[in-house]
Amino acid sequence: MATEKTYPMTQEGKQKLENELEDLKTVKRKEVVERIKIARSFGDLSENSEYDAAKDEQAFVEGRITQLENMIRNAVIITDNGEESTVVTLGKTVTFKELPNGDEEAYTIVGSAEADPFEGRISNDSPIAKSLLGKQIGEKVAIQTPGGEMQVEIISVK
């Protein structure tokens, strides 16, 4: 029997997924059913673009519900006591600077289910996170990026 994939995430990330799931089940599902009902009233379904669009949206909503239920069921909560650490681990915010004279950047390393680079939350599967995980403050690390190799120094881990 195959083992199901686990989804490391913070409690906050799990709550966001649970909220999205609740919205999909209680609001979006009903909206889509109503749109299908209205589109059916237009008659011939073979050339009914409103009906096709509503059915496509229904498939998307149901697929997302299934995906969220699986992620929530297989969530592994990352516990963080909020204390500073010297080692980069999942759930920690790491600040580093590009060498030799680059700007400082900070990212929180989270599971892929709650990654949002625009919010400073990167997936533990990303090249940056993979390079930083397990490293310590003061360590110099080579990170492979699409633009080439980047040398950084870890400044802090919180």
UniProtKB/Swiss-Prot annotation:
Please give the Pfam families that the UniProt record associates with this protein.
GreA_GreB, GreA_GreB_N
**What is the role of this chain?**
Necessary for efficient RNA polymerase transcription elongation past template-encoded arresting sites. The arresting sites in DNA have the property of trapping a certain fraction of elongating RNA polymerases that pass through, resulting in locked ternary complexes. Cleavage of the nascent transcript by cleavage factors such as GreA or GreB allows the resumption of elongation from the new 3'terminus. GreA releases sequences of 2 to 3 nucleotides.
UniProt keyword annotation of Chaperone present: no
Keywords associated with the record: Coiled coil, DNA-binding, Transcription, Transcription regulation
Recorded protein name is Transcription elongation factor GreA
InterPro entries registered for this protein in UniProt? GreA/GreB_C_sf, TF_GreA/GreB_CS, Tscrpt_elong_fac_GreA, Tscrpt_elong_fac_GreA/B, Tscrpt_elong_fac_GreA/B_C, Tscrpt_elong_fac_GreA/B_fam, Tscrpt_elong_fac_GreA/B_N, Tscrpt_elong_fac_GreA/B_N_sf
Origin: domain of life = Bacteria
Q: Which residues form a coiled coil?
A: 4-75
Which family does the record assign? Belongs to the GreA/GreB family.
- State any single GO MF term: DNA binding
Matching Gene3D superfamilies: Transcription elongation factor, GreA/GreB, C-terminal domain (3.10.50.30), Transcription elongation factor, GreA/GreB, N-terminal domain (1.10.287.180)
Tell me, which GO biological process terms does this entry list? DNA-templated transcription elongation; regulation of DNA-templated transcription elongation
